[in-house]
Amino acid sequence: MQYYLNGFTPRNPNLAKSPTLPHRPELPTHVDVLIIGSGPAGLTIGAQLSAFSEISTVIIDQKNGPLQVGQADGIACRSVEMFVAFGFSERVLKEAYWVNEVSFWKPDDAVQGHIVRSGRILDVEDGLSEMPHVILSQARIHDFFLEHMRNGPLSLEPHYNSRFVNLARDDSADYPLRVMVECRSSDGVGTDLKTIRARYVVGCDGARSTVRKAIGRRLKGDTANQAWGVMDVLANTDFPDIRLKSVIHSAKEGSMLIIPREGGYLVRMYIELDKLDPGERIGNKHLTQDRLIAAARRIMAPYTLSVKEVSWWSVYEIGQRLCDRFDDSKPGAKNHGTEDAEQNARIFIAGDAGHTLSPKAGQGMNVSMGDGFNLGWKLAAVLRGQAKPSILATYSHERQALARELIDFDRDFAKMFSARPKTQENTDDNSVDPAVFQQYFQKQGRFTAGVSVRYPPSTLTGDGKHQKLAEGITVGMRFHSAPVIRVADARRLHLGHQFLADGRWRLLLFAGRAADLGALCEYLTIHLLRRFTPTGADIDAVIDMRAILQGSYRSIDLARLPPSLL
């Protein structure tokens, strides 16, 4: 017999430890959480909630099946760190293109109409993250999330051909939200209207979100009146940096961003096209893929571009829009994680439903997954009775503020990208020095990597009053992983990679010597671990406590360590 898990269990180790419930093709009448939309935000929330058999979760989507061809492809360092918690980061890294360096090209002062390389830098500065910035199709990321959910105790899968119609709220009911869903038959002919009662609803249904409209929120913002095209191509070219992420500013033909795709063949090109008149829509331009190819050739001169195949292309307008809140709290309610604010919040929006960005900075999918990662565990903690419902108010407080920062960055980045480069012939105030643009790109590296996020004080986040006790771990920021050696088996690993999306709270003790831990661990075990751990459960079932010690691991005697650390 072949053993797969723990040396004695003949089963797939990727499957849930608890008995797996079969997926039910019909929609239930009552659920704890109803997720509307199976994009990056919806799947991230679903992946987190799929770990808990005691939480009933349903995902609906009006599409007829999973995403086949994804528009987004850039995966920030922080997102890859997040994938560790779901167990598929290694698969992403194996399949993806790694963005190691970025090259910058500017107009050639010696030859009019030509471009020349002006710089080449690291895409991610050393020490920022143990994970790289990578490129992989959004559809493939969806595949990993879907597999993770299927392997969980709920066997969770989206219900496709199911469209959200409307909802109503009755706070006196055990399931306060009544949601109407239109279900299409598999042949696409017949429809059936069904009612689902839910405790919480999360709208992850994109920029035209019907959930957002149902709670009276709207996206606010503007456009830059600039058309851009994007295409994934198989091409022959003598451009020397075709397998590097490359930023090109030509003198008069516009700008372009080149991003190699996974697999070693395709290349994605973002191509600046025409200016739009105020109020003009890009659809009126009747742009074609041939127009995109011709523009790319002009920008890349003197280098040649022979496109053999276009696997996907699209055109878009640069625009940034933001919703003022990401939940259905009433006006005037505080959003700092207070009890009063949460009592008004049962419906949430995430991803493009709450914010839209231009694609070139590669933030859209990453921020959407970050929204889901932020909200998913909070819903689980509340529904499992581990936290007060007031923590749910921190979601909008934290993520809306971050989205506002991203939009400000995206607006500046898009403006600089579309500006004509300063040359000997062009010195007007609206132009940008290529060297200044490169410096700006480098300066914003932490931001685009997703590791500069710092949440403000709230119910969950301290005010930094004791920050001096651990200056290397900033209160409100993500836990920066570091290499360690596990004492028990001398295995070298990353500390942050030991924390899975399993709903447990983490308590890390940083100590100089093992002898310093005895009294503290005894106190924490009595007043914290035993207090919150259900009778009969493992001592780390709710709070996972670990110690990080200095010095040689060989000098540590396991027999002398506190039992709660073993």
Kindly give the residue locations of the regions a language model identified:
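Active-site-adjacent segment of FAD-dependent monooxygenases/related oxidoreductases
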Residues: 68-151, 155, 159, 168-171, ...
